[in-house]
Structure formats: structure tokens, C-alpha cells
Regions:
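A conserved, hydrophobic alpha-helical segment in the catalytic core
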Residues: 127-137, 230-243, 273-304
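Conserved mixed alpha/beta catalytic, RNA-binding, or beta-rich assembly cores of soluble enzyme
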Residues: 330-333
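Gly/charged, well-structured mid-domain segments that form the phosphate/adenylate-handling core
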Residues: 255-257, 289-324, 328
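Acidic-glycine-rich active-site phosphate/pyrophosphate-binding loop
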Residues: 65-70, 253-265
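Conserved small/polar residues in nucleotide/adenosyl-binding loops
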Residues: 371-377
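Cys/His-rich short segments
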Residues: 195-255
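Phosphate-binding loop of NTP-binding sites
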Residues: 3-190, 195-207, 212
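Charged helix-capping and loop-helix junction motifs
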Residues: 149-154, 364-370
Length: 378
């Protein structure tokens, strides 16, 4: 460790202590900004302290990262993470340089499970050479920042190419993740909860992105669709089909706004958060846990924790009313929340707030792509 990098770490930790412990503020970005300004190569110099897992994609990063963290901790690993969702270079640097690093009880290196903004994957991967990339999904999102979905995926691929030995664990239900000219080992997770006798071949709804075959750019068809462009797809023009799944949802029992019960690889599980889309997040965490040899029963226990995830379906009690706060930032995420809302059997009031801040996207035209009529009918 050089004098410059030592100074960077001391400065970052001191600023974090001041912001977090004295002023009781978040301290999620400034410590990292100070560290990078003192030593631009600080991440490269501390990479040997951790095994790194990068979690990226459009939707589900924060919850997936939190669930992976719980699962690995249940498996005996020491885990460092960015729970507030501060997922750009400054926030990630701040998380790592201020972390109190201790060896895992199992004698292995601590694992840094980091939610990473898609546009920042290349910077982080180039500096730290991750052990695993976890890819959740790619949907139309913040066009003013990312462009279309294939541009977004190209940014992720650029990061993957910096770490050719890393495993790429991707959502196999998303056709776009079958693309890419990188040489990394690929493993896939997805849904197989519908029996072949119940398949109903169909095409994705109008305006759905990411449904073109990687072989000839024809429009894919589906044996079933879970939501948006996700499902069991196949080409009608050649032999291209969804890749073989290494981990799969094998059944779904209950879908409610407050919890879901389902099975992954025939292991019964429950998560204390609603929505079909959140089963994907749990499936992702299950897959990571199994890749790190965490026993399924320990994963089950980790999922059943009712600890809330910062900013994700937070439940509050205000003036005698139960309030649930749900963050949405793009059409697919919003439509998924609408699907979850219509499973509520009791009457409820809905308040929707829209902002145009940079972090959430200054272009709000995406609200024109919502299917609110379905919710109104219910």
C-alpha cells in the first residue's frame, strides 16, 4: 500500500465517520469521491482484499444484492455491500475503502457483493477483476443516460471482457443475455414452473424490447411469458431456443403484495416481499448461493428474514394507516408493480409521485407506455 493510497483510505474513513456517526447523514458518496481524488487507482490497490461479485441490470439490483448478501452470510461468509443502492464509482469506492475488513469465519476472503450501475460496470471490472457477474435483466430505462437496450448490454459486455475468468450468471429467460462474444463461462437461471402440456405459444406484447433472435434477428416466440420479454422463448426460423437452465423456479404457490411462496430446484421457499418480479430476484440470490456452496436450507432461512430492504417495498405505519412505498423507474418495473397491486384483495388508496431528477432519469416520457387500464378494470 503506497502513501497515496493510505492517505486516500484514511481520508475516506474520516469523512465517513464525520458524515455518518457525527452528522447522521448517509455518507455513501463523498468518502469515495475524496478517495478517488487522492488516489485514482485506489480500487486496483485494494482488490486483493475481496472476492468481488458485480450485480447489474435494469431492474432488481438493490433487492437482489441484499438477498445475495443474506444468503452468503448464512453460508458463513463475511460480506461487504452497498445496501443504500449507491451504485456508481464514487459510492462503490466509498463502500470498499471504508469497510472494516475481517476474514470470513470459514477462512475465506470476504466477499464484496456490489450493485453496480450498468454504465459503471466497465470501470469497476477494469479496476478489480470480479469473480462473478450477475445479470438480472435489461429493459428500456433512462434513455437519456443509457440509450436503447443493446447499447446498455454493450456497456456490460465491455466490463465482462476485463475479467475473462469470471463466471457470468445470467437470467436465461432474457433473450439478450444469449448474445455477446466474450469467452467467460456462462450459467443461467430462469422459470420452468409451467408443464409442457400447458404451454401456449405466443408472441410478446406490442412495444416489448429485446425479443429478437441473436442468430437472425427474427422475432422470437414463447412457450410462456412471465412478464415483459422474459420467459421460455424459441425461434421459428431456426433451432435457437432458450439455453439450458442451471437453476430454475419449478413451481409458484402464492403471489400476494406482501409475500410469495414458490420452489427453486424443488426446494420450497418464501420471501417476505410481493410480486412475481421479486421471485426472479430470489432465484438470482439462490443461484449465487449455490455457486458458493451455501446449503439450500440456509438459503431458505435467509429468505424468510423479514428485515426490510432500503427503498424497496418499505412498509410504514402513518396516522393509523399501513403504507407501502414502492420505487419504479421504467415501464416494465411499473407494469410489474401494477400486476402485483391487482393481487391485493382488500381496498386500498394509490398515490403516485413522479420526478425528473438525474438519478432516476430526466426523460419521463416512459409513463406513456404503462397499461393502467388493466389495473382500472380490477
Amino acid at each position: 500500500m503506497t502513501l497515496r493510497s493510505t492517505l486516500a483510505r484514511v481520508t475516506a474513513k474520516s469523512s465517513y465517520w464525520l458524515l455518518h456517526d457525527v452528522l447522521h447523514r448517509g455518507g455513501t458518496s463523498l468518502p469515495g469521491k475524496l478517495a478517488v481524488s487522492i488516489d485514482p487507482n485506489i480500487l486496483t490497490k485494494i482488490q486483493q482484499d475481496f472476492e468481488l461479485i458485480i450485480v447489474t441490470g435494469t431492474n432488481g439490483k438493490t433487492l437482489t444484492t441484499a438477498l445475495i448478501t443474506r444468503v452468503l452470510q448464512a453460508g458463513g461468509y463475511t460480506v461487504i455491500t452497498n445496501p443504500s443502492g449507491s451504485n456508481m464509482i464514487q459510492g462503490i469506492t466509498g463502500t470498499l475503502v471504508t469497510a472494516k475488513v475481517k476474514p470470513s469465519p470459514n477462512g475465506k476472503k470476504p466477499i464484496a457483493v456490489l450493485e453496480v450501475d450498468e454504465a459503471n460496470v466497465e470501470k469497476i471490472a477494469a479496476a478489480m477483476k470480479p469473480k462473478m457477474f450477475v445479470l438480472t435483466n435489461i429493459f428500456r430505462d433512462q434513455l437519456d443516460r443509457y440509450g436503447e437496450i443493446y447499447t446498455t448490454y454493450d456497456k456490460i459486455i465491455a466490463g465482462i471482457k476485463h475479467a475473462p475468468k469470471a463466471v457470468v450468471l445470467a437470467n436465461g429467460d432474457s433473450p439478450i443475455f444469449t448474445r455477446g462474444d466474450f469467452t467467460n463461462e456462462r450459467k443461467y437461471f430462469g422459470f420452468n414452473h409451467i408443464q409442457p402440456t400447458d404451454y401456449n405459444p405466443t408472441v410478446a406484447p406490442i412495444n416489448t424490447d429485446g425479443i429478437l433472435s441473436p442468430t437472425d434477428h427474427s422475432v422470437l416466440e414463447y412457450d410462456f411469458i412471465t412478464y415483459a420479454n422474459l420467459g421460455k422463448y424459441f425461434s421459428t426460423t431456426d433451432s435457437f431456443v432458450r439455453p439450458k437452465l442451471n437453476y430454475q423456479v419449478t413451481s409458484i404457490t402464492d403471489l400476494t403484495p406482501k409475500y410469495s411462496t414458490f420452489s427453486i430446484d424443488n426446494t420450497p421457499l418464501r420471501i417476505e416481499i410481493g410480486g412475481l418480479y421479486n421471485i426472479y430476484n430470489a432465484l438470482t440470490a439462490f443461484a449465487v448461493g449455490r455457486e458458493f456452496n451455501v446449503d439450500p436450507e440456509k438459503i431458505k432461512t435467509a429468505f424468510e428474514s423479514n428485515a426490510q430492504i432500503f427503498g424497496r417495498q418499505e412498509a410504514l405505519h402513518v396516522d393509523g394507516k399501513d403504507v407501502t412505498i414502492v420505487l419504479i423507474k421504467n415501464p416494465v418495473g411499473t407494469n410489474s408493480v401494477i400486476d402485483m397491486m391487482v393481487t391485493e384483495k382488500d381496498d386500498f388508496s394509490l398515490l403516485a409521485l413522479l420526478n425528473a431528477n438525474y438519478a432516476d432519469g430526466i426523460d419521463t416520457s416512459w409513463i406513456c407506455l404503462l397499461y393502467t387500464s388493466d389495473a382500472a378494470d380490477d
